[in-house]
Amino acid sequence: MTARIDAAFARCRAEGRAALVTYVMAGDPDPETSLKVLEALPKAGADIVEFGLPFTDPMADGPAIQAAGLRALKAGQDLRGTLALVRRFREGDDRTPVVLMGYYNPIHTYGVPRFLEDAQAAGIDGLIVVDLPPEEDEELCLPAREKGLAFIRLATPTTDAARLPAVLANTAGFVYYVSITGVTGTATPDFGRVSQAVGRIAAQTDLPVVVGFGVRTGAHAAEIARGADGVVVGSALVDALARSLEPGDRAGSGTVEAVAALVRELSEGVRSTVKTGA
């Protein structure tokens, strides 16, 4: 299923621009609203969607995404329900790539073979599992690749030249460069250093390199888009959703539009920038 991911990047390259990759938490604030948000993302300009798996101990996530996960869990969202949402999304959209992003525990509990079968059937294109290092590829990465699912790795500012080959081994779809140290949504990246890091990674792989963590505005997205193959935005979208909620974490009449409006701004930022070398 990496074909959808490859096709998305090919379309962006043909337009001379970076891809916009948007992250939202599955089931936030409730499953039905979450599906409407998921459906709104491509229409507002997202090229690829990352769909977060709610988990009780999200060690790499900042306050915004932690809160989103708690809202989703409170609403009864689990891995089975997340796959069901993607199946429903696929009824109306067979083009936009969907990448599940989360932690290994829910997948392990579900059962890896059953998860991979169900993910493939639901129309999942790839996985980002932040707490499975390359040394544990046999747990999920290699079985996922056998099923045609992209296993996408994170590289960070602390990933040195000795470590990078291990990070890139068995990676498919794209490489996700984390632009800051720390948790999501807590700082603004140094755009100059990010560009240098992207160049260093790109010299070692033919895969697209996308950049996330700390990207919150259309202007941020435009800066990253100059040198990266894709721009990932998550915490800012989750924040926009949270601000739209009614008391009791209930969806408001403007919840879906609050997210879509920011995606349109981010999309304009990405599309306003001609990618370096394009």
From Swiss-Prot:
Q: Which residues form the active site?
A: 50 (proton acceptor), 61 (proton acceptor)
Question: What pathway, per the record?
Answer: Amino-acid biosynthesis; L-tryptophan biosynthesis; L-tryptophan from chorismate: step 5/5
A GO cellular component annotation here is: cytosol
Which top-rank group of organisms is this from? Bacteria
Task: Give the catalytic activity.
Answer: (1S,2R)-1-C-(indol-3-yl)glycerol 3-phosphate + L-serine = D-glyceraldehyde 3-phosphate + L-tryptophan + H2O
Under Gene3D superfamilies, the record lists: Aldolase class I
UniProtKB keywords: Amino-acid biosynthesis, Aromatic amino acid biosynthesis, Lyase, Tryptophan biosynthesis
Instruction: Please give the CDD domains that the UniProt record associates with this protein.
Output: Tryptophan_synthase_alpha
The record's EC number reads 4.2.1.20
Instruction: Answer whether the UniProt record assigns the keyword Lyase to this protein.
Output: yes
One MF annotation (Gene Ontology) recorded for this entry: tryptophan synthase activity
PANTHER family noted in UniProt: TRYPTOPHAN SYNTHASE ALPHA CHAIN, CHLOROPLASTIC (PTHR43406:SF1), TRYPTOPHAN SYNTHASE, ALPHA CHAIN (PTHR43406)
Give the quaternary structure. Tetramer of two alpha and two beta chains.
Name the protein family: Belongs to the TrpA family.
Q: What does this protein do?
A: The alpha subunit is responsible for the aldol cleavage of indoleglycerol phosphate to indole and glyceraldehyde 3-phosphate.
Q: What is this protein called?
A: Tryptophan synthase alpha chain
Per UniProt, what is the name of the gene that codes for the protein in this document?
Answer: trpA
